[in-house]
Amino acid sequence: MTQKELAYFEDAVGHESNIIKILEDLLKSISDNRVVEFIKEETGKHSVRKEKLINFLKEQSNE
């Protein structure tokens, strides 16, 4: 993997982390249960994406 590609993946992990933090902070101020459930689902999706990116980077470092 080139340095440019590595930087892209590191940025993507950072972006996913930021989105997760924003969604978690947003949850603290929402009282509508439908909206809360939607935000929790979205947080879960972004957590999965972040883990996939991290796992991919780990696999690349082992090669």
What are these regions (language model features)?
Residues 1-63:
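His/Met- and acidic-residue-enriched segments that coordinate or traffic transition-metal cofactors
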